[in-house]
Amino acid sequence: MTQAFMSYEELLERAYSMLPRRRRRSTGERFVLPTFEVSKTGKKVYIHNFKDVAEKLNREPPVLLRFILKEIALPGVYENGTAVIHGEVSAQTLNKLLERFYNEYVKCPVCEAPDTILVKEKKLMYIKCTACGAVSPVKPF
């Protein structure tokens, strides 16, 4: 049995060749943040694609709605895949809140992947990333 000795540089090069190539992720290469489809009737605002947006963010619709309603300080309900807000709020404001929710409660702060789970233990909330395994605390709402 003969043993071939490799230099440190050769071993290092071999190890690097076995690692998966790391891609640079540009904003939106893999995940595109959806926008709300909003209509107004009187003093009510309807978000028609609310369930679809919540599913794309991997969050329950009532959780997303609770965040939005607390931020705009208006009452509202979720029914049949549509969110109904009782009050006047612009589509631009709602989409900015959606972007803020994504940055604070969906996107992993370590690897910036959108593949996360929101975990609530007692009074604490965490984001657990399914891509890198990181667990990061977030401000409860």
From Swiss-Prot:
One Pfam entry name: eIF-5_eIF-2B
InterPro entries hit by this protein: IF2/IF5, TIF2_bsu_arc, Transl_init_fac_IF2/IF5_dom, Transl_init_fac_IF2/IF5_N, Transl_init_fac_IF2/IF5_Zn-bd
Keywords noted in UniProt: Initiation factor, Protein biosynthesis
Chain segments annotated as coiled-coil in the UniProt record: none
GO molecular function, one term: translation initiation factor activity
Alphabetical list of SMART domains matching this protein: eIF2B_5 (SM00653)
Domain of life: Archaea
RNA-binding is among the record's keywords: no
Function, as annotated: eIF-2 functions in the early steps of protein synthesis by forming a ternary complex with GTP and initiator tRNA.
Family as reported in the entry's similarity comment: Belongs to the eIF-2-beta/eIF-5 family.
Subunit structure comment from the entry: Heterotrimer composed of an alpha, a beta and a gamma chain.
Protein name: Translation initiation factor 2 subunit beta
Native species: Thermofilum pendens (strain DSM 2475 / Hrk 5)
Lineage, opening ranks: Archaea, Thermoproteota, Thermoprotei, Thermofilales, Thermofilaceae
